Amino acid sequence: MKNIHQTAVVEDGARIGEDVKIEAYAFVSKDAVLGDNVTIKQGARVIGNTQIGDNSKIFSYAIVGDIPQDISYHDEENTGVIIGKNATIREFCTINSGTHKGDGLTRIGENAFIMAYCHIAHDCLIGNNIILANNATLAGHVELGDYAVVGGLTPIHQFVKVGESCMIAGASALSQDVVPFCLAEGNRAYIRSLNLVGIRRRFEKEQVEELVKAYKFLFNQGVSLKDQAGELFEKTNDTNVKKMCKFILETTRGIPLAKGRD
């Protein structure tokens, strides 16, 4: 059963799942796909080739799927937004469609919790179980790993990669890549420590201990981070530690470290 308010605009061609609720003055475009049990609240807009997974909620005046804020974009076809199941997108968020400079899609995984006034720009790749606090701003092509958390009022520079289970503190400004399982803070943000709160929520005690040992080895003051990562990658059998090392070895924007580190 669909519950569509008489003042809502749902264009012909939109694919609407079961038990969908579309409130007053909301808009859903002809190319949109809404999964089952989706709620589009008052005044929200779902535009263009946008897919929203089951059990997701788009709150009032959020705009999902509008064209990118990119001066090189010229109405390319086959671009859009894909959002996984159980997403919560709060008031006044903006999520832009992808461009042909990426694969054409802005992607957000399952169980995303995106608070009011956040912005996700074109071609971002967002993992599962992420949290963006109020006014977090992701520029184009940013990648967030699973379980990443971005604090309020924090901008992230285009093409930056944030690893899984990272925490970027509120009111920071991030312009380089953050190693999985780490916490970064400051303007400009640099890595301060492991994200112990986050990893203790996800992993067993023994796994946490391996990450603590790896962090101490990698971030030893005065030693090259990439040299340490290369050495540890060959020595360890721990999957999470290998992820940390691989990330460091493959970064293109560099890792933000305290002054005096390389």
From Swiss-Prot:
GO terms for molecular function: acyl-[acyl-carrier-protein]-UDP-N-acetylglucosamine O-acyltransferase activity. Pathway: Glycolipid biosynthesis; lipid IV(A) biosynthesis; lipid IV(A) from (3R)-3-hydroxytetradecanoyl-[acyl-carrier-protein] and UDP-N-acetyl-alpha-D-glucosamine: step 1/6. It comes from the Bacteria. InterPro entries: Acetyltransf_C (IPR029098), Acetyltransf_C_sf (IPR037157), Hexapep (IPR001451), Hexapep_transf_CS (IPR018357), Lipid_A_LpxA (IPR010137), Trimer_LpxA-like_sf (IPR011004). It is found in: Cytoplasm. It catalyses: a (3R)-hydroxyacyl-[ACP] + UDP-N-acetyl-alpha-D-glucosamine = a UDP-3-O-[(3R)-3-hydroxyacyl]-N-acetyl-alpha-D-glucosamine + holo-[ACP]. PANTHER family: ACYL-[ACYL-CARRIER-PROTEIN]--UDP-N-ACETYLGLUCOSAMINE O-ACYLTRANSFERASE, ACYL-[ACYL-CARRIER-PROTEIN]--UDP-N-ACETYLGLUCOSAMINE O-ACYLTRANSFERASE, MITOCHONDRIAL-RELATED. HAMAP family: LpxA (MF_00387). Belongs to the transferase hexapeptide repeat family. LpxA subfamily. This is Acyl-[acyl-carrier-protein]--UDP-N-acetylglucosamine O-acyltransferase. The gene is lpxA.
